[in-house]
Swiss-Prot record:
Pfam families tied to this protein: Hydrophobin_2
Family: Belongs to the cerato-ulmin hydrophobin family.
Disulfide bond entries: C29-C79, C39-C70, C40-C52, C80-C92
Main location: secreted
InterPro entries, A to Z: Cerato-ulmin_hydrophobin, Hydrophobin_sf
Role summary: Aerial growth, conidiation, and dispersal of filamentous fungi in the environment rely upon a capability of their secreting small amphipathic proteins called hydrophobins (HPBs) with low sequence identity. Class I can self-assemble into an outermost layer of rodlet bundles on aerial cell surfaces, conferring cellular hydrophobicity that supports fungal growth, development and dispersal; whereas Class II form highly ordered films at water-air interfaces through intermolecular interactions but contribute nothing to the rodlet structure.
Protein name according to UniProt: Class II hydrophobin 1
Tissue occurrence: Expressed in mycelium, conidiating mycelium and aerial hyphae.
Cell location: Secreted; Secreted, Cell wall
Length: 98
């Protein structure tokens, strides 16, 4: 009888625990240095992004959504360290999921 009670308690505890991975919102630029999402025309060796603008949705929901909003203006998604405000960004790399 004690064995049955112990098994039932362990089974109940196992069912009460959350299963699987909890979904997190997509972060296109998880790197602390390259944390600014941008849509850029040109990337010169990862040092300077030219023709860069902020995506219409500053935090896209997925890699596909980020690419789609940038491709709508014929640009590519990038993560940059600093934006100059003159459609140029410094230190750019591909975002997460690319």
């Amino acid at each position: 009888m004690q064995f049955f009670t112990t098994v039932v308690l362990f089974a109940a505890a196992a069912m009460a625990l959350p299963g699987g991975q909890q979904s997190r919102p997509y972060d296109p630029c998880p790197n602390n240095l390259l944390s600014v999402p941008q849509c850029c025309d040109t990337d010169a060796l990862g040092l300077v992004g030219l023709g860069c603008v902020a995506p219409p949705n500053n935090r896209p929901a997925s890699p596909r959504a980020f690419a789609d909003c940038c491709h709508a203006s014929s640009r590519r998604p990038k993560c940059c360290a600093v934006t100059t405000g003159l459609e140029a960004s410094v230190l750019c790399d591909d975002p997460a999921g690319f």
